[in-house]
Amino acid sequence: MRPLLEMRGITKRFPGVVALDGVDFELLPGEVHVLLGENGAGKSTLIKILSGAYRPDGGEILMDGRPVEIRSAAEARRLGISTIYQEFNLVPQLTVAENIHLGRQPRRFGVVDRGAMERAARELLERLGIRVDPRARVADLGVARRQMVEIAKALGLRARVLIMDEPTAALSEREVRQLFRIVRRLKEEGVGVVFISHHLEEVAEIGERVTVLRDGRLVGRVSADAGRDELVRMMVGRSIEEQFPRRRTEPGEVLLEVRGLGRRGVLRDVSLRVRAGEIVGVAGLVGAGRTELARAIFGLDPADSGEVLVEGRPLEAPGPQEARRRGVGFVTEDRQGQGIVPPLSVAENLALASLERYLRGRVLVDRGRLLRRAREIVQSLRIRTPSLEQEIRYLSGGNQQKAVIGRWMLAGSRVLIMDEPTRGVDVGAKVEIYELMNRLTEEGAGILMISSEMPEVLGMSDRVLVMSGGRITGELPAEEATQERVMGLATAGSEAAVG
């Protein structure tokens, strides 16, 4: 069978970096070809070349056996190439229907036909099994539903080649099943899918072949049913003996206590404790209230009732500034939207939460001392960046995430609320983040970890709190926590209204 898409000897250089070095890739009609590699391996550069964001410095691209040049995103779309990026490409102020049809709205007598646009959007959403009102503003949707709208938008373009960059990162298990059903339907129609994922368990389930990149080079191409150990070895160049290297420490004093926290419509009478030296995991289905709990504790979304205590004392004026001042840090689930400031440098992003700690007098920042400490953090966390002055937007997702965590280390936080700490992070970087979490707890910090990845919750938590319907439905010590028990608690009372 002739390939639908071929990339031969693709090379791309940036100042001081060879991002791609003679990489080959091919995609057959109706094939799901999985692209694997650590952050910084070259995956993002490869798909940006295919989507028209970058132009290669060498090599050629063929569609249906004919050479093509992809000079822009519009040209990629004209060739039938559509990309769903890991970070959202939606306009929050517009409705779901407007985002799905952006740039190609149906018109009648020269005017946008909103009825036709909303009907078409509704049909597409129903095809995907997404329960979202096409008239809803994207800004009012959670991360999972925004991701599904992004997928609907791309599929609405009727692409022949669909590039999916971490499409399942923000989805629940049920939503992943829905997505996979749609992908299989696209395969039957002859659409080729380039599927990028860090979830190795998805590879054999959805893919036919796997191409692995490392440090900008092609490591090899294997069948999707290759074992996990082989794939990990190809990705990182070494074996990972233990994916979740949790080192248990003896819990100390209570650092964070939440008493009867409530917020109308999302949280109901939530109480919990986090001690020094422990990781408390929070599990639950999408919509259970986990992120809302994290934001309420940190003061981003004020609670209607209850209180938050840090080291035994209530927060005097609940809010992010007070929480930060008292030693609480927050790693958001939305890295691009709320975690980093893309135009600022790595050093500036690291310093965002701790400038007052480096003041000389009342106004001037001791830049030398701050940069020395920031450099220590970068080296300690192995953040791959040409310099501290590099704009953080040019770092890979994994290095950006390590910088967000490093920000709170620089601030000296003793309590860390981590919402999806390894979302969009590759296997090797995940282990580095887990080791960092171990180090923080060994140094006396307490971590409240919210995660949609069940193996992560079970593998890294000392205790697991399970949420459903805005309340905590159960608590399990690590030795008693199983996927079955967690899921049982996660579905308990999920239909109950939150008061």
From Swiss-Prot:
Q: What is its EC number?
A: 7.5.2.7
Q: Which domain of life is it from?
A: Bacteria
Q: Indicate what this protein is called per its UniProt record.
A: Ribose import ATP-binding protein RbsA 1
Q: Which PANTHER family match?
A: CARBOHYDRATE TRANSPORT ATP-BINDING PROTEIN MG119-RELATED, GALACTOFURANOSE TRANSPORTER ATP-BINDING PROTEIN YTFR
Q: Specify the protein's topology with respect to the membrane.
A: Peripheral membrane protein
User: Which ranges of the sequence are coiled-coil?
Assistant: none
Q: Give the UniProt family note.
A: Belongs to the ABC transporter superfamily. Ribose importer (TC 3.A.1.2.1) family.
> What PROSITE patterns does the database record attribute to this sequence?
ABC_TRANSPORTER_1 (PS00211), ABC_TRANSPORTER_2 (PS50893), RBSA (PS51254)
Substrates-to-products reaction catalysed: D-ribose(out) + ATP + H2O = D-ribose(in) + ADP + phosphate + H(+)
| GO CC terms in record | plasma membrane
Q: How does it assemble?
A: The complex is composed of an ATP-binding protein (RbsA), two transmembrane proteins (RbsC) and a solute-binding protein (RbsB).
Task: Provide this UniProt record's keywords sorted from A to Z.
Answer: ATP-binding, Cell membrane, Membrane, Nucleotide-binding, Repeat, Sugar transport, Translocase, Transport
CDD domains (UniProt xref): ABC_Carb_Monos_I, ABC_Carb_Monos_II
Q: Which gene encodes it?
A: rbsA1
Span of domain ABC transporter? 5-240, 249-494
Nucleotide-binding among keywords: yes
GO terms for MF: ABC-type D-ribose transporter activity; ATP binding; ATP hydrolysis activity
The family database entries (InterPro entries) matched by this protein are listed as: AAA+_ATPase, ABC_carbohydrate_import_ATPase, ABC_transporter-like_ATP-bd, ABC_transporter-like_CS, P-loop_NTPase
**Main function:** Part of the ABC transporter complex RbsABC involved in ribose import. Responsible for energy coupling to the transport system.
Provenance organism = Rubrobacter xylanophilus (strain DSM 9941 / JCM 11954 / NBRC 16129 / PRD-1)
Q: Which positions are annotated as binding ATP? A: G37, E38, N39, G40, A41, G42, K43, S44
Task: Reply yes or no: does the keyword Nuclease apply.
Answer: no
